[in-house]
Amino acid sequence: MAKLSLIQREEKREKLVAKYAKKYAELKATIDDQSKSEEERYAARLALQQLPRNAYPTRLRARCGITGRPRGTFRKFGLGRTKIRELAFRGDIPGVVKASW
């Protein structure tokens, strides 16, 4: 089980990313738009740098919904590999069966 502080830190980052998502997208679009002047694009780059560090989506880490484990998580289930295995063997995940051939 991950430390509670790490799980809460990740939740805090998710809130910050959601809060600044619109502004982040607008600034990125301005920077990538070749029709804008160089000064406008440079100003957008500076404004993007002024956003909080944790407002960047790349800083988010997928964690297991049960244990908080940061590695080996499956997006489809939102769970870590060990918990998927446990729940699948018990039959708690619909449609997931052990492979046999």
UniProtKB/Swiss-Prot annotation:
Record InterPro entries: Ribosomal_uS14, Ribosomal_uS14_bac/plastid
Gene Ontology biological process terms from the UniProt entry: translation
Keywords, comma-separated and alphabetical: Ribonucleoprotein, Ribosomal protein, RNA-binding, rRNA-binding
Recorded GO CC terms: cytoplasm; small ribosomal subunit
Disulfide linkage: none
Source organism, top-level taxon: Bacteria
GO molecular-function terms, A-Z: rRNA binding; structural constituent of ribosome
Gene3D superfamilies listed in its UniProt record: 1.10.287.1480
Pfam families: Ribosomal_S14
Similarity remark: Belongs to the universal ribosomal protein uS14 family.
Subunit annotation: Part of the 30S ribosomal subunit. Contacts proteins S3 and S10.
Task of the protein: Binds 16S rRNA, required for the assembly of 30S particles and may also be responsible for determining the conformation of the 16S rRNA at the A site.
Protein name in the entry: Small ribosomal subunit protein uS14
Species this chain originates from: Leptothrix cholodnii (strain ATCC 51168 / LMG 8142 / SP-6) (Leptothrix discophora (strain SP-6))
